Amino acid sequence: MKTDSMEAVHLDYENEEAVKQAQQIGASAWLALASGEANQLNATNALSHLTDLQVRDFALGVIGTATPNIQALISAFIDYSISDKNPDIDAPLHALRAYAYLCEGNTDKADLELKACFSLNSDYSLARLFERTLTAGWETDFYPKMAQELHPKVSDKIFG
């Protein structure tokens, strides 16, 4: 689903119950996509909930801990979804795509995705983090390790 026809979800963080429910919807959609359930509802929920940092970080964990075949499926989904017309959704997608490339060890393509992200949101924090780690010369095997360490914590926060 192209993001130019989609509204990003903006949560009222004072309503903890609504936030948790929205996070569970977004995270569940990423799990469904990773298990091969690519349909309109899952695509919409996965994309529109990326404005929430917990859902975005959950998506990082799904990508970072996925098998290569699932990573390819998610990468194709992200490629298809980016429209560069909705920065609230597309900036996180570019950052997720950069992360997928970093997990593969492809720093050149990751750098291109980070530049695309910055063209939409020059202060996007996750992209800045990846940019700093690339500039510092961190080994790319760090990224999947990061996902393996952080994903259970993010999952517990969303679903616990």
Where are these regions (language model features)?
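Charged, compositionally biased boundary regions
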Residues: 1-160
